[in-house]
Amino acid sequence: MLDKIKNLSELLSNMGALREKMEDVKKRIASIRVVGDAGAGMVTVTATGEGQIINVFINKQLFDSDDNKMLEDLVMAATNDALKKAKEATAYEFQAASGGLDFSEISKMFGGNFG
């Protein structure tokens, strides 16, 4: 328990620098663009580091098919792939900014589930 209080004290003493670093991380995350794909690139989805879908590409050949379920599945798979990549890229930015600090451990100190 005393170690946790000491760690918290150190964290609080560096709040100004931490705020600046977090603002920088926010900017980098906002600039992240990742592409998820499915069907060997027949469907691609672009997402931001903030988890917003900003572009969807569907190859024209898929519109000629009568298999709507296949198209739906490809769009869903590409979207999930893009969001997974965005989450991984965001986690990487946080890890890089914190010098490898595990945010899930900090979260546990406060009884939360942020990481």
From Swiss-Prot:
Protein family: Belongs to the YbaB/EbfC family.
Subunit and partners: Homodimer.
Keywords annotated in UniProt: Cytoplasm, DNA-binding
Protein name: Nucleoid-associated protein LBJ_3002
Cellular localisation: Cytoplasm, Nucleoid
Species of origin: Leptospira borgpetersenii serovar Hardjo-bovis (strain JB197)
Leader sequence residues: none
GO molecular function, one term: DNA binding
Function according to Swiss-Prot or TrEMBL: Binds to DNA and alters its conformation. May be involved in regulation of gene expression, nucleoid organization and DNA protection.
PANTHER family: NUCLEOID-ASSOCIATED PROTEIN YBAB
GO cellular component: bacterial nucleoid; cytosol
Transferase in keyword set: no
InterPro entries with a match to the protein in the record: YbaB-like_sf, YbaB/EbfC
Entries under HAMAP family matching the protein: DNA_YbaB_EbfC (MF_00274)
